[in-house]
């Protein structure tokens, strides 16, 4: 077997990037694991070097505007038509797809404790548990929010998702994504995005892993517009990392899983599909370290809208209304004067799925712990609990740095419907709404 997964795998164009990765967001990258594997000045020569096949992977229609047109050319040992066979529909376990109406959506604010890592041996595909779905995968709108609880690496197994793009948010344990485009390593504090149609397997190099997964049925994630903020801050393009080419020349039988049409399918292959020796284009997986996010905040007074913490956005057909926004609440200085500093009380047309990667969330110091989840659906009120309100209302307003904390939110324009699994989970807190019961009447018309 000839395997080229050395972290210093050859990159023909950038000698100064981090070994194994190329820097930038949405760039037209090019990389080769063998010298001369990439054709020069053309995409599909009559005969490719090393006896490779040229294949295009399109993430957008051919006629999409240039700025939104996504595609990559892959030079591989076998074309993808040899990576498919007789597909058999199999049990998707607890993985669900929108629209999913298996449970009446409770009209309530909801919160879950962390789900324990199971003792069973579960690969990535087996470990996915869907918490909420929104929109309709068949019309390429909306999303699903999942958790994963992986206890075993995928061995002689691979997967791709035809229904959506996948954004992984590790919370405990590291993940290695062995993809057609190269290898991505992630740990808590980082994210990985795997585009629709990209084949990969998930390995757990440091043991069992738990985290969150957003399945994006709509437009691909992109960087938000900065507007008056200007040319810098938030998530900067140079901090996104795309892998250099790496391949397997392996004739060992493997199983390929495909998520398509809301179902899970399987086929047997006589070889590894991770056989791309070189590639070029702008449609590829990537990773991002959330700790490089440069936050913007109030330096005078008032609490700004949480949209200033948007890392990535999946746009909809309505300008400024996201199919999904991926938002984080990172370490930052809080300095606003004469201001209630935590997030304010709120009712929102958007639906908010929140998770906590590590630390303490300032609006919910109790009950919302790392690995946990909260769901505040469209037009359901939410905000700080009694403890957070009392502290923020009475504390001395000096500059404070929020350290050791990282929360996130999947926010969508669609109501998020709770799955049967989520609604019946032992992790569901039946007393979440009680956190606001201590907010007593404080009104006194005689005291301005």
Swiss-Prot record:
Reported cofactor(s): Fe cation
GO terms in the biological process aspect are: L-phenylalanine catabolic process; tyrosine catabolic process
Record-linked NCBIfam families: hmgA
Question: Which superkingdom is the protein from?
Answer: Bacteria
Q: What does this protein do?
A: Involved in the catabolism of homogentisate (2,5-dihydroxyphenylacetate or 2,5-OH-PhAc), a central intermediate in the degradation of phenylalanine and tyrosine. Catalyzes the oxidative ring cleavage of the aromatic ring of homogentisate to yield maleylacetoacetate.
Under the heading HAMAP family, the entry gives:
Homogentis_dioxygen
Q: Report the family membership.
A: Belongs to the homogentisate dioxygenase family.
> Which species is the source of this protein?
Nitrobacter hamburgensis (strain DSM 10229 / NCIMB 13809 / X14)
Reaction(s) catalysed by this chain's protein: homogentisate + O2 = 4-maleylacetoacetate + H(+)
- Name the residues that bind Fe cation: 346, 352, 382
Give one Pfam hit by family name.
Answer: HgmA_N
Instruction: Name one cellular component (GO) term.
Output: cytoplasm
Q: Which UniProt keywords apply?
A: Dioxygenase, Iron, Metal-binding, Oxidoreductase, Phenylalanine catabolism, Tyrosine catabolism
The protein's name in its UniProt record: Homogentisate 1,2-dioxygenase
Entry-linked InterPro entries: HgmA_C, HgmA_N, Homogentis_dOase, Homogentis_dOase_bac, RmlC-like_jellyroll, RmlC_Cupin_sf
**Keyword match Iron:** yes
Q: EC?
A: 1.13.11.5
Residues annotated as signal peptide:
none
Question: Which biological pathway?
Answer: Amino-acid degradation; L-phenylalanine degradation; acetoacetate and fumarate from L-phenylalanine: step 4/6
Q: How does it assemble?
A: Hexamer; dimer of trimers.
A GO term for molecular function = iron ion binding
Which residues constitute the catalytic centre? 303
Task: State where homogentisate binds.
Answer: 361, 382
